[in-house]
Amino acid sequence: YRTYETPGDAVRNATRLVEAGADAVKFEGIKPDILDALRKEGITVMCHIGLNPQHEQEEMKRGRIARGKRLDEAARLIEGAALLQAHGAGLMILEKIPEKVSKIITENLGIPTIGIGAGKYCDGQVLIVHDLLGINERKFKHCPDYIDHRAMMITAFARYRREIDGGIFPAEKHANIIDDAEYRSVVEWCAASGYTV
């Protein structure tokens, strides 16, 4: 977040990531100037269009999540995807775009598209792990209810607390045990060294 406000910021931060072992970087939005600067440095770039969750938190809170449902938005996304490909994008992430619009984008690009809530016509799919595992309280239309880890975690934490409060945990089976003879040696050493046992 806020690591690519200018082309210089983008290059500086992306270079650090690549030096640390990243194979590529990703940024949100239709920003050919940022893409040009990164590609000039030989950095592989994945672009992310549609919903830009790092920059649109307030709109998301108001419930406006899908992008491309109106002609002007759909046209901007289709043209933006083509523009980013022309500037060297290696992959396009399409987030919360209507399935039919994602199909048009995918069919008009020569690079892979990865959808997150963008329908079945993308070349691949991705979900946020917290959504996939049901860890977040908020549920999203594009993510099936595979499992409710949130409820499982709440149950586990409540049990953990009850067992601590009730003196059940930790039990002897959870403790590391020292040999009696070795412990006597520790006690003798403590006495000789001024430690209370």
Where are these regions (language model features)?
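Alpha/beta enzyme core
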Residues: 1-197
